Amino acid sequence: MSITITTWNVNSLKVRQPQVLDFLKETENSILCLQELKMQEADIDAAAFKKVGYTLDAFGQKTYNGVATILRDPLTFLPDEEVRNIPGFEDPQSRLLATTVQVGSEKLRVINGYFPNGETVESEKFPYKLAWLEALVQWLPSQLEEYPNLVLLGDFNIAPEDRDVWDPES
């Protein structure tokens, strides 16, 4: 079975839900991973996704962050295998959702992340970003061992060149 996977930083699902639903209808994407939902799970209209043939699993947070993985029917989540945030890393922010998807007779591990933006090296946010990335690096080998079919995707918030950002002067 062939699948298509797309990742999209929506910068507010509340604002972009119509465009996301249009995208799903037009592309018949197998798996869509969203970042920067900026809303809690309870506020997401999961029925709207179901209506167009998709199942949604989200890990949200009011106003900031949040990730969601959306599957086209007949793909299904294995809910007992879901992980929210990096195990062993205390984090009040909703930044990572690891789900397992049944694809025919195979399992696919989808790790959807909204990686921290460390801003500049001098920023007080930079040590948090480095600690988060280190925790991810420490956790990933166990995931690869358990799930040989694994995809890590999302908004990595890494911009090595000016052309990688919207406004390099800011």
Could you describe each region identified by the protein language model?
Residues S123-P127, D167-S170:
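Short glycine-enriched, charge-decorated loop/helix-capping segments at active-site entrances
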Residues L32-Q35, A58, L152-G154:
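Active-site neighborhood of phospho(di)ester-bond hydrolases with catalytic His/Asp-centered motifs
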Residues V52, W132-S170:
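Metal-dependent phosphoesterases centered on the DNase I-like endonuclease/exonuclease/phosphatase
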Residues L37-K38, I44-T120:
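Structured beta-strand-rich core segments of catalytic domains in phosphoester-bond hydrolases
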Residues D22-L24, R95-S105, A135-P148:
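Short amphipathic alpha-helices and their capping/turn segments at secondary-structure boundaries
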Residues S12-R16, D91-Q93, Y128-L136:
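Soluble or luminal CAZymes and related metallo-dependent hydrolases
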Residues S2-S12, K107-E122, L153:
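Active-site-proximal beta-strand elements of phosphoester/diester hydrolases
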